Curated annotation (Swiss-Prot):
Name of the gene encoding the protein in the UniProt record: hemL
Pathway: Porphyrin-containing compound metabolism; protoporphyrin-IX biosynthesis; 5-aminolevulinate from L-glutamyl-tRNA(Glu): step 2/2
Origin organism lineage: Archaea, Methanobacteriati, Methanobacteriota, Methanomada group, Methanobacteria
Keyword set, alphabetical order: Cytoplasm, Isomerase, Porphyrin biosynthesis, Pyridoxal phosphate
First-listed, main subcellular location of the protein, grouped into a coarse class: cytoplasm
Full protein name: Glutamate-1-semialdehyde 2,1-aminomutase
Amino acid sequence: MFSKDLFQESKKFIPGGVSSPVRAFEPYPFFVKKASGSKIYDVDGNKYIDHCLAYGPLILGHADPKVVREVSNQLTIGSAYGTPTENEIILAKEVVDRIPSAEMVRFVNSGGEATMSAIRLARGFTGKDKIIKFDGAYHGAHDYTLVKGEPGKSCVPDTKGIPLDTAKNTYSVPFNDEEALSDLIQKDGDNIACLIMEVVMGNIGCIEPKKGFLEFVRKITEENNILLIFDEVITGFRLARGGAQEYYGVTPDLTTMGKIVGGGLPMGAFAGKKEIMELIAPNGPVYQAGTFSGNPISVQAGISTLKQLDNQFYKDLERKGNFLRSNIQSIIDEQGYNITPVGCGSMFQIYFNPAPVYNNDDAHNSDAKRFLRYFRALLKEGVFIPPSQFECNFISSAHSMEDLTQTAEAIEVALEVAFKKKG
Protein backbone atom coordinates (compact mmCIF):
# COMPACT_ATOMS: atom_id res chain seq x y z
CA MET A 1 0.00 0.00 0.00
CA PHE A 2 1.06 3.60 -0.63
CA SER A 3 1.15 6.36 1.99
CA LYS A 4 -2.17 7.83 0.83
CA ASP A 5 -3.91 4.45 1.23
CA LEU A 6 -2.22 3.70 4.54
CA PHE A 7 -3.33 7.06 5.93
CA GLN A 8 -6.95 6.35 5.02
CA GLU A 9 -6.67 2.92 6.63
CA SER A 10 -4.98 4.34 9.70
CA LYS A 11 -7.78 6.87 10.28
CA LYS A 12 -10.21 3.99 10.72
CA PHE A 13 -8.40 2.78 13.84
CA ILE A 14 -6.19 5.61 15.13
CA PRO A 15 -7.64 9.08 15.92
CA GLY A 16 -6.58 11.38 13.12
CA GLY A 17 -4.56 8.55 11.64
CA VAL A 18 -1.48 9.38 13.72
CA SER A 19 -0.12 8.85 17.22
CA SER A 20 0.95 12.50 17.63
CA PRO A 21 -0.84 15.47 16.02
CA VAL A 22 2.12 17.16 14.32
CA ARG A 23 2.60 14.11 12.09
CA ALA A 24 -0.74 14.65 10.33
CA PHE A 25 0.32 17.14 7.69
CA GLU A 26 -1.72 17.78 4.53
CA PRO A 27 -2.70 16.15 2.27
CA TYR A 28 -1.33 13.09 4.07
CA PRO A 29 1.93 12.14 5.79
CA PHE A 30 4.35 9.77 4.14
CA PHE A 31 4.64 6.39 5.85
CA VAL A 32 8.18 5.24 6.61
CA LYS A 33 9.55 1.91 5.42
CA LYS A 34 13.06 2.16 6.87
CA ALA A 35 15.78 4.60 7.88
CA SER A 36 19.56 4.52 8.05
CA GLY A 37 22.12 7.17 8.89
CA SER A 38 20.96 10.55 7.59
CA LYS A 39 18.30 9.09 5.29
CA ILE A 40 14.68 8.05 5.69
CA TYR A 41 12.76 6.00 3.10
CA ASP A 42 9.00 5.91 2.59
CA VAL A 43 6.69 3.19 1.28
CA ASP A 44 6.22 5.17 -1.94
CA GLY A 45 9.85 4.67 -2.95
CA ASN A 46 11.14 8.12 -1.95
CA LYS A 47 14.38 8.83 -0.11
CA TYR A 48 14.85 11.93 2.04
CA ILE A 49 17.73 13.59 3.84
CA ASP A 50 16.22 13.69 7.32
CA HIS A 51 16.46 16.89 9.36
CA CYS A 52 13.48 16.01 11.54
CA LEU A 53 15.33 13.09 13.13
CA ALA A 54 12.26 12.02 15.13
CA TYR A 55 12.09 15.58 16.54
CA GLY A 56 15.54 15.46 18.06
CA PRO A 57 16.55 12.14 19.67
CA LEU A 58 18.71 10.80 16.84
CA ILE A 59 21.92 12.75 17.27
CA LEU A 60 23.83 9.80 15.78
CA GLY A 61 21.37 9.42 12.91
CA HIS A 62 19.14 6.43 12.25
CA ALA A 63 20.12 2.88 13.20
CA ASP A 64 23.59 3.71 14.51
CA PRO A 65 25.54 0.42 14.27
CA LYS A 66 26.86 0.51 17.85
CA VAL A 67 23.45 1.31 19.32
CA VAL A 68 21.77 -1.38 17.19
CA ARG A 69 24.34 -4.01 18.16
CA GLU A 70 24.30 -3.34 21.90
CA VAL A 71 20.52 -2.94 22.13
CA SER A 72 20.09 -6.18 20.17
CA ASN A 73 22.34 -7.95 22.67
CA GLN A 74 20.25 -6.60 25.55
CA LEU A 75 17.05 -7.81 23.89
CA THR A 76 18.34 -11.38 23.95
CA ILE A 77 18.59 -11.31 27.76
CA GLY A 78 15.35 -9.50 28.57
CA SER A 79 13.32 -6.42 27.77
CA ALA A 80 11.90 -5.58 31.22
CA TYR A 81 12.59 -6.88 34.71
CA GLY A 82 10.79 -4.76 37.29
CA THR A 83 14.04 -4.68 39.28
CA PRO A 84 17.15 -2.47 39.24
CA THR A 85 20.02 -3.18 36.86
CA GLU A 86 23.70 -2.27 36.90
CA ASN A 87 23.23 -0.44 33.61
CA GLU A 88 20.98 2.09 35.37
CA ILE A 89 23.95 3.01 37.55
CA ILE A 90 26.22 3.27 34.51
CA LEU A 91 23.80 5.61 32.73
CA ALA A 92 23.20 7.62 35.90
CA LYS A 93 26.95 8.15 36.27
CA GLU A 94 27.13 9.32 32.65
CA VAL A 95 24.38 11.88 33.27
CA VAL A 96 25.86 13.11 36.55
CA ASP A 97 29.32 13.38 35.00
CA ARG A 98 28.04 15.45 32.09
CA ILE A 99 25.23 17.70 33.35
CA PRO A 100 26.49 20.50 35.67
CA SER A 101 23.30 20.60 37.78
CA ALA A 102 23.06 16.81 38.19
CA GLU A 103 24.09 15.27 41.50
CA MET A 104 21.42 12.57 41.32
CA VAL A 105 19.09 11.44 38.53
CA ARG A 106 15.78 9.58 38.26
CA PHE A 107 14.85 7.82 35.00
CA VAL A 108 11.30 7.99 33.62
CA ASN A 109 9.62 7.16 30.32
CA SER A 110 9.45 10.46 28.42
CA GLY A 111 10.40 14.09 28.50
CA GLY A 112 6.84 15.02 29.42
CA GLU A 113 6.90 12.67 32.39
CA ALA A 114 10.24 14.18 33.41
CA THR A 115 8.89 17.75 33.46
CA MET A 116 5.73 16.70 35.28
CA SER A 117 7.78 14.90 37.93
CA ALA A 118 10.28 17.75 38.31
CA ILE A 119 7.47 20.25 38.89
CA ARG A 120 5.92 17.97 41.52
CA LEU A 121 9.32 17.65 43.17
CA ALA A 122 9.81 21.43 43.18
CA ARG A 123 6.44 21.88 44.84
CA GLY A 124 7.28 19.23 47.40
CA PHE A 125 10.66 20.79 48.16
CA THR A 126 9.45 24.39 48.45
CA GLY A 127 6.01 23.79 49.92
CA LYS A 128 4.60 26.20 47.32
CA ASP A 129 2.08 25.51 44.56
CA LYS A 130 2.44 27.98 41.71
CA ILE A 131 4.81 27.74 38.76
CA ILE A 132 6.06 29.99 35.96
CA LYS A 133 6.57 29.04 32.32
CA PHE A 134 7.25 31.10 29.21
CA ASP A 135 4.69 31.80 26.48
CA GLY A 136 4.91 29.23 23.70
CA ALA A 137 7.13 26.85 25.63
CA TYR A 138 6.14 23.20 25.47
CA HIS A 139 6.90 20.97 28.42
CA GLY A 140 4.82 17.94 27.53
CA ALA A 141 1.12 17.22 27.19
CA HIS A 142 0.30 17.28 30.91
CA ASP A 143 -2.02 19.55 32.84
CA TYR A 144 0.65 21.58 34.66
CA THR A 145 2.00 23.37 31.59
CA LEU A 146 -0.45 22.87 28.70
CA VAL A 147 -1.89 26.27 29.56
CA LYS A 148 -1.73 29.86 28.35
CA GLY A 149 -2.18 33.28 29.87
CA GLU A 150 -1.34 36.97 29.98
CA PRO A 151 1.65 38.26 31.98
CA GLY A 152 0.87 38.62 35.67
CA LYS A 153 -2.40 36.70 35.43
CA SER A 154 -3.17 33.07 36.20
CA CYS A 155 -3.34 30.84 33.15
CA VAL A 156 -6.29 29.14 31.51
CA PRO A 157 -6.28 25.69 29.86
CA ASP A 158 -4.80 25.45 26.36
CA THR A 159 -6.88 22.36 25.59
CA LYS A 160 -10.20 20.85 26.56
CA GLY A 161 -9.95 18.46 29.47
CA ILE A 162 -7.77 20.50 31.83
CA PRO A 163 -9.59 21.90 34.90
CA LEU A 164 -9.45 25.67 35.27
CA ASP A 165 -8.40 25.24 38.90
CA THR A 166 -5.31 23.36 37.73
CA ALA A 167 -4.37 26.00 35.17
CA LYS A 168 -4.72 28.77 37.76
CA ASN A 169 -1.57 27.54 39.49
CA THR A 170 0.55 28.42 36.45
CA TYR A 171 1.78 31.81 35.26
CA SER A 172 3.11 32.47 31.76
CA VAL A 173 5.31 35.39 30.72
CA PRO A 174 7.04 36.32 27.44
CA PHE A 175 10.44 34.75 26.82
CA ASN A 176 13.40 37.14 27.00
CA ASP A 177 11.33 39.72 28.92
CA GLU A 178 13.13 40.58 32.16
CA GLU A 179 10.63 43.24 33.17
CA ALA A 180 7.57 40.98 32.89
CA LEU A 181 9.28 38.24 34.88
CA SER A 182 10.47 40.66 37.55
CA ASP A 183 7.01 42.20 37.93
CA LEU A 184 5.40 38.79 38.34
CA ILE A 185 7.87 37.58 40.95
CA GLN A 186 7.59 40.84 42.85
CA LYS A 187 3.82 40.38 42.87
CA ASP A 188 3.56 36.72 43.90
CA GLY A 189 7.04 35.29 44.39
CA ASP A 190 6.23 33.95 47.86
CA ASN A 191 3.78 31.47 46.31
CA ILE A 192 5.90 30.34 43.35
CA ALA A 193 7.61 26.95 43.62
CA CYS A 194 9.54 26.94 40.37
CA LEU A 195 10.21 28.46 37.01
CA ILE A 196 10.50 25.93 34.19
CA MET A 197 12.03 26.96 30.88
CA GLU A 198 13.42 25.66 27.63
CA VAL A 199 16.88 27.21 27.51
CA VAL A 200 16.50 27.40 23.74
CA MET A 201 12.83 27.41 22.79
CA GLY A 202 12.86 24.46 20.42
CA ASN A 203 9.12 23.88 20.35
CA ILE A 204 8.36 27.25 18.86
CA GLY A 205 11.04 27.02 16.19
CA CYS A 206 14.43 27.86 17.64
CA ILE A 207 14.64 30.93 19.89
CA GLU A 208 17.83 31.55 21.83
CA PRO A 209 17.94 33.53 25.07
CA LYS A 210 19.13 37.11 24.75
CA LYS A 211 22.55 37.83 26.17
CA GLY A 212 22.28 38.06 29.95
CA PHE A 213 18.73 36.72 30.15
CA LEU A 214 19.64 33.33 31.62
CA GLU A 215 21.87 35.00 34.20
CA PHE A 216 18.99 37.30 35.13
CA VAL A 217 16.60 34.35 35.50
CA ARG A 218 19.10 32.47 37.65
CA LYS A 219 19.66 35.48 39.91
CA ILE A 220 16.01 36.43 40.43
CA THR A 221 14.92 32.85 41.15
CA GLU A 222 17.71 32.36 43.69
CA GLU A 223 16.86 35.64 45.42
CA ASN A 224 13.21 34.61 45.78
CA ASN A 225 13.64 30.94 46.76
CA ILE A 226 12.16 29.74 43.48
CA LEU A 227 13.64 26.58 42.00
CA LEU A 228 14.90 26.96 38.44
CA ILE A 229 14.17 24.01 36.15
CA PHE A 230 15.86 23.80 32.78
CA ASP A 231 13.79 21.74 30.37
CA GLU A 232 16.60 20.20 28.33
CA VAL A 233 14.47 17.56 26.66
CA ILE A 234 15.65 18.95 23.32
CA THR A 235 18.94 20.66 24.22
CA GLY A 236 20.23 18.04 26.66
CA PHE A 237 23.28 16.36 25.03
CA ARG A 238 22.37 18.24 21.83
CA LEU A 239 24.26 21.53 22.18
CA ALA A 240 27.16 20.31 24.28
CA ARG A 241 28.35 17.38 26.37
CA GLY A 242 26.66 19.02 29.36
CA GLY A 243 23.66 20.36 27.47
CA ALA A 244 22.54 23.97 27.13
CA GLN A 245 23.58 24.75 30.70
CA GLU A 246 27.17 24.02 29.73
CA TYR A 247 26.75 25.77 26.38
CA TYR A 248 25.50 29.00 28.00
CA GLY A 249 27.25 28.68 31.36
CA VAL A 250 24.21 28.89 33.66
CA THR A 251 23.31 26.11 36.11
CA PRO A 252 19.71 25.44 37.26
CA ASP A 253 18.48 23.57 40.34
CA LEU A 254 16.80 20.80 38.35
CA THR A 255 17.15 19.58 34.78
CA THR A 256 14.74 17.52 32.71
CA MET A 257 15.90 15.36 29.82
CA GLY A 258 14.40 13.19 27.10
CA LYS A 259 15.07 12.36 23.46
CA ILE A 260 18.88 11.86 23.30
CA VAL A 261 19.19 10.41 26.82
CA GLY A 262 17.29 7.35 25.56
CA GLY A 263 19.29 7.01 22.37
CA GLY A 264 16.19 6.99 20.17
CA LEU A 265 14.08 4.81 22.46
CA PRO A 266 11.40 6.00 24.94
CA MET A 267 13.20 7.53 27.92
CA GLY A 268 13.19 10.61 30.08
CA ALA A 269 15.08 11.73 33.16
CA PHE A 270 15.18 14.51 35.71
CA ALA A 271 18.22 15.41 37.75
CA GLY A 272 19.40 17.97 40.25
CA LYS A 273 20.91 18.75 43.59
CA LYS A 274 21.08 15.87 46.04
CA GLU A 275 19.15 17.72 48.75
CA ILE A 276 16.23 18.13 46.34
CA MET A 277 16.39 14.74 44.63
CA GLU A 278 16.41 12.81 47.90
CA LEU A 279 12.84 13.93 48.53
CA ILE A 280 11.71 11.46 45.87
CA ALA A 281 10.19 8.15 47.03
CA PRO A 282 11.31 5.79 48.44
CA ASN A 283 13.65 8.16 50.33
CA GLY A 284 11.21 11.02 50.66
CA PRO A 285 7.55 12.07 50.51
CA VAL A 286 7.36 13.04 46.80
CA TYR A 287 5.94 10.08 44.90
CA GLN A 288 7.14 9.10 41.44
CA ALA A 289 7.02 5.64 39.85
CA GLY A 290 6.60 3.80 36.57
CA THR A 291 6.52 0.22 35.32
CA PHE A 292 8.94 0.97 32.49
CA SER A 293 11.10 3.55 34.29
CA GLY A 294 14.73 2.58 33.79
CA ASN A 295 13.72 0.06 31.13
CA PRO A 296 16.83 -1.99 30.24
CA ILE A 297 16.40 -1.56 26.48
CA SER A 298 16.15 2.22 26.65
CA VAL A 299 18.91 2.40 29.25
CA GLN A 300 21.24 0.43 27.01
CA ALA A 301 20.42 2.68 24.05
CA GLY A 302 21.19 5.68 26.23
CA ILE A 303 24.54 4.28 27.33
CA SER A 304 25.47 3.28 23.78
CA THR A 305 24.66 6.79 22.56
CA LEU A 306 26.20 8.92 25.31
CA LYS A 307 29.47 6.97 25.25
CA GLN A 308 29.99 8.27 21.71
CA LEU A 309 29.36 11.93 22.56
CA ASP A 310 32.72 13.43 23.53
CA ASN A 311 33.89 17.03 23.17
CA GLN A 312 35.31 16.44 19.69
CA PHE A 313 31.92 15.06 18.63
CA TYR A 314 30.30 18.38 19.50
CA LYS A 315 33.00 20.42 17.76
CA ASP A 316 32.38 18.43 14.58
CA LEU A 317 28.61 18.80 14.91
CA GLU A 318 28.88 22.54 15.53
CA ARG A 319 31.06 22.83 12.43
CA LYS A 320 28.34 21.14 10.38
CA GLY A 321 25.69 23.40 11.87
CA ASN A 322 27.72 26.51 11.08
CA PHE A 323 28.31 25.28 7.52
CA LEU A 324 24.61 24.80 6.82
CA ARG A 325 23.50 28.01 8.53
CA SER A 326 26.16 29.96 6.62
CA ASN A 327 24.90 28.53 3.32
CA ILE A 328 21.31 29.39 4.24
CA GLN A 329 22.30 32.95 5.13
CA SER A 330 24.16 33.33 1.82
CA ILE A 331 21.08 32.20 -0.13
CA ILE A 332 18.87 34.66 1.74
CA ASP A 333 21.32 37.53 1.23
CA GLU A 334 21.86 36.81 -2.46
CA GLN A 335 18.14 36.56 -3.22
CA GLY A 336 17.07 39.36 -0.88
CA TYR A 337 14.50 37.32 1.02
CA ASN A 338 13.01 39.19 3.97
CA ILE A 339 13.09 36.25 6.38
CA THR A 340 14.97 35.33 9.55
CA PRO A 341 17.25 32.28 9.76
CA VAL A 342 18.07 31.13 13.29
CA GLY A 343 19.90 28.34 15.04
CA CYS A 344 22.73 27.22 17.28
CA GLY A 345 24.86 24.10 17.51
CA SER A 346 23.16 21.43 15.43
CA MET A 347 19.76 23.17 15.46
CA PHE A 348 18.37 25.42 12.72
CA GLN A 349 15.17 26.96 11.40
CA ILE A 350 13.92 29.72 9.13
CA TYR A 351 11.17 32.08 10.31
CA PHE A 352 9.13 33.51 7.46
CA ASN A 353 9.20 36.78 9.33
CA PRO A 354 11.36 39.82 8.47
CA ALA A 355 11.93 40.84 12.09
CA PRO A 356 14.13 39.22 14.74
CA VAL A 357 12.35 36.54 16.76
CA TYR A 358 12.74 36.79 20.53
CA ASN A 359 9.51 35.30 21.85
CA ASN A 360 6.25 33.51 21.08
CA ASP A 361 4.49 36.58 19.66
CA ASP A 362 7.37 37.25 17.28
CA ALA A 363 7.33 33.63 16.10
CA HIS A 364 3.60 33.74 15.42
CA ASN A 365 4.04 36.78 13.20
CA SER A 366 5.61 34.42 10.69
CA ASP A 367 3.90 33.58 7.40
CA ALA A 368 2.57 30.05 7.97
CA LYS A 369 1.24 29.67 4.42
CA ARG A 370 4.61 30.53 2.93
CA PHE A 371 6.29 28.07 5.27
CA LEU A 372 3.93 25.34 4.09
CA ARG A 373 4.92 25.98 0.47
CA TYR A 374 8.55 25.80 1.56
CA PHE A 375 8.01 22.53 3.44
CA ARG A 376 6.27 20.86 0.50
CA ALA A 377 8.94 22.05 -1.92
CA LEU A 378 11.66 20.61 0.32
CA LEU A 379 9.92 17.24 0.28
CA LYS A 380 9.92 17.31 -3.51
CA GLU A 381 13.65 18.05 -3.40
CA GLY A 382 14.25 15.08 -1.09
CA VAL A 383 14.67 16.86 2.25
CA PHE A 384 12.43 16.20 5.26
CA ILE A 385 12.00 18.75 8.02
CA PRO A 386 9.22 18.93 10.64
CA PRO A 387 5.97 20.07 8.97
CA SER A 388 5.55 23.10 11.21
CA GLN A 389 7.05 26.58 11.38
CA PHE A 390 7.10 26.06 15.13
CA GLU A 391 9.43 23.07 15.33
CA CYS A 392 13.20 22.89 15.13
CA ASN A 393 15.32 21.18 12.48
CA PHE A 394 18.32 19.07 13.44
CA ILE A 395 21.65 17.78 12.16
CA SER A 396 23.17 14.46 13.23
CA SER A 397 26.70 13.10 13.11
CA ALA A 398 25.50 10.86 10.27
CA HIS A 399 24.93 13.87 8.01
CA SER A 400 27.87 14.21 5.63
CA MET A 401 29.05 17.50 4.17
CA GLU A 402 27.57 16.27 0.90
CA ASP A 403 24.20 15.81 2.64
CA LEU A 404 24.38 19.35 3.99
CA THR A 405 25.33 20.77 0.61
CA GLN A 406 22.34 18.98 -0.93
CA THR A 407 20.13 20.33 1.86
CA ALA A 408 21.32 23.88 1.16
CA GLU A 409 20.64 23.42 -2.56
CA ALA A 410 17.16 22.10 -1.76
CA ILE A 411 16.49 25.05 0.53
CA GLU A 412 17.47 27.43 -2.28
CA VAL A 413 14.91 25.79 -4.58
CA ALA A 414 12.25 25.60 -1.85
CA LEU A 415 12.62 29.30 -1.05
CA GLU A 416 12.15 30.11 -4.73
CA VAL A 417 8.91 28.13 -4.64
CA ALA A 418 7.83 29.71 -1.35
CA PHE A 419 8.30 33.17 -2.82
CA LYS A 420 6.79 32.02 -6.14
CA LYS A 421 9.96 32.59 -8.10
CA LYS A 422 9.77 28.97 -9.21
CA GLY A 423 7.25 26.12 -9.34
